[in-house]
A protein has these predicted regions:
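Interface amphipathic segments
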Residues: 1-152, 157-211
Length: 211
């Protein structure tokens, strides 16, 4: 019995992802080590949710997923995750740096999780290379280009809103599934609440397609 009120602290020391192998599908492999800690307090005699914070940090983490009978490896230089619940606000944060690739970072807040559940926060993608997915393509097919995004969250959990821009620069996808021979192109997706617009120019050997 945890009692009507109390506090718990837990440390996670060198949790090896190999221990999860029996619970993973055959097409997924994971390696690396996680460390972290959790600090949670509760008081059932008062209204509201428990208070607490959880942090996780990965080291030498690598995930390989088999897609179309080909392995797609993803290695992480940095993999930090955090979750916090204090003062009637829940927050999730992340910082992910891919080996020889870009960075993903951001945070999402939910204010009044038991009531209005208002959303705020941001999602950032920096210099992410599409070439990472080339291992799953057939011979002669490829993807190139860089993805960058600066996005902001709004609205609430029931009706989320997204603001900002996502850009693809130098994007060039060659494959039998493409209806034309694509050349390096520029694309941008602009988000304004519940609406979005696609802009840019797709270059082909036959000319340009303006969006």
């Amino acid at each position: 019995d945890a009692g009507a009120s109390g506090r718990a602290r837990v440390n996670l020391n060198r949790f090896d992802l190999a221990m999860l192998k029996p619970f993973m599908p055959e097409a997924t492999q994971a390696s690396g080590v996680f460390t972290g800690n959790a600090d949670v307090s509760w008081d059932t005699t008062k209204e509201g949710l428990p208070q607490g914070k959880v942090t996780l940090s990965g080291r030498n983490v690598k995930v390989t997923q088999v897609v179309n009978d080909a392995p797609l490896p993803v290695a992480f230089d940095t993999l930090n995750l955090s979750a916090d619940l204090h003062n009637n606000r829940a927050e999730l944060g992340w910082l992910i740096r891919l080996t020889n690739n870009g960075q993903l970072d951001g945070q999402v807040q939910v204010t009044d999780p038991q009531g209005r559940r208002n959303l705020s926060g941001n999602v950032n993608i920096s210099n992410f290379s599409l070439a990472m997915i080339n291992p799953i393509f057939a011979r002669g097919e490829k993807a190139e280009g860089r993805l960058n995004a600066r996005l902001r969250l709004g609205g609430n959990v029931k009706s989320p809103q997204l603001f900002g821009q996502m850009q693809l620069s130098g994007v060039d996808i060659d494959g039998n599934f493409m209806p034309f021979d694509m050349q390096p192109s520029q694309l941008a997706m602009n988000f304004n609440g519940t609406r979005s617009t696609l802009q840019g120019t797709v270059n082909t050997r036959q000319g340009q397609i303006a969006l």
